[in-house]
Amino acid sequence: MNKELLDDILSLEDKAVSEIENASSLQDLEKVRLSYLGKKGVIKAYFDNLKEIEDAGKKRNLGEVINVLRNKLDQLIMSKENILKAEEVNFKLQNEAVDITLSARPEKIGKVHPLSKVLNEVKLIFAHMGFKAVDGPDIEDEFHVFDALNTPSHHPAREEQDTFYLKNKIDDKRMVLRTHTSSVQIRTMEKTKKFPIKIVAAGRVYRNDFDATHTPMFHQIEGLYVDENVNMGQLKFTIHHFLNKFFGDKGLKIRFRNSFFPFTEPSAEVDISYKGSKWIEVLGCGMTHPNVFQNVGIDHTKYNGFAFGIGIERLAMLKYQISDLRSFYDNKISWLDHYGFHFSSLR
């Protein structure tokens, strides 16, 4: 065996092992690997030098020694690589970990608008009383908003100072933004003659008015109950039950006052005294006028019914002590943060 080459190999082994052990990063280790095991590395040069040895026995023995060294260095490099990778991971975990003791970023959660809350609550109360929720169009013809509801052409509600009329007619009919959801009652009675009819219609309505207690657009829910032998006592029970449930006060003071609406006879306005306040009007109601039944093809000698209309904004203002109706539509986040509700409040 060529003694000089053998001594050189043994000396190289000590040097390579030391460099592998002292490598402080994966980049340094890769340089060591290329230096010894790469295509232009020392081990490759040793194998090339074997070609110059003529003695086959010496060539074979030196080749085995070089192979052993190559395998040893390869194993040492793999082992060192695993160690360095583990150290790198630990370093990242220590320096990039989230400190859970720090205060979390404030989370902004949206809130349910008071009108959405009240609408949902009102419909739920009436649903428990057997009323079915129905919908209708916001843009209506005069027949469904006024004529069918026994509102004559000279009635003040039909004047342009109170009602929004559209410029263009549809099928030669004058169109309006509905002033109440009673138009949905008319459409329902036109479509079905299956009794009892027991519905509530909630939605946007429009009137030409704007101040602290009025807005051009607001929300109403109107109810209708039609069957044989419907009476005023049933109407009063329905109103009492609803108001007691909504305000959560079984001792709520409620009074009915005689009034006039063209679509009901007799008619009444309902006042409440809430939390010791003075009497406040909350809704209008009455027994459905026979002319309304005639206009939709229902025999008023056999069937009768009652109807009521409630302003959603009015209920919300009373229950949550909101003084200005216009604040519902100002889109102020600070206002909604104060008066809004968590989504879980919707039942």
Curated annotation (Swiss-Prot):
Compartment(s) where it occurs, according to its Swiss-Prot or TrEMBL record: Cytoplasm
Q: Which reaction does it catalyse?
A: tRNA(Phe) + L-phenylalanine + ATP = L-phenylalanyl-tRNA(Phe) + AMP + diphosphate + H(+)
Q: Which InterPro entries match?
A: aa-tRNA-synth_II, aa-tRNA-synth_II/BPL/LPL, Phe-tRNA-synth_IIc_asu, Phe-tRNA_ligase_II_N, Phe_tRNA_ligase_alpha1_bac, Phenylalanyl-tRNA_Synthase, tRNA-bd_arm
Q: Which GO terms describe its cellular component?
A: cytoplasm
Which cofactors go with this protein?
A: Mg(2+)
Question: Per the UniProt entry, what is one GO biological process?
Answer: phenylalanyl-tRNA aminoacylation
Class in the EC hierarchy, top level: ligase
UniProt remark on cofactor binding: Binds 2 magnesium ions per tetramer.
Q: Any idea which UniProt keywords this protein has?
A: Aminoacyl-tRNA synthetase, ATP-binding, Cytoplasm, Ligase, Magnesium, Metal-binding, Nucleotide-binding, Protein biosynthesis
- Protein's name according to its UniProt entry: Phenylalanine--tRNA ligase alpha subunit
Under the GO molecular function aspect, what terms does this record hold?
ATP binding; magnesium ion binding; phenylalanine-tRNA ligase activity; tRNA binding
Q: EC number(s) for this protein?
A: 6.1.1.20
The positions annotated for binding Mg(2+) are: E265
What is the gene name?
pheS
Name the species this protein comes from.
Wolbachia pipientis wMel
Self-association and partners:
Tetramer of two alpha and two beta subunits.
Q: Which family does it belong to?
A: Belongs to the class-II aminoacyl-tRNA synthetase family. Phe-tRNA synthetase alpha subunit type 1 subfamily.
The record ties this protein, via HAMAP family, to: Phe_tRNA_synth_alpha1
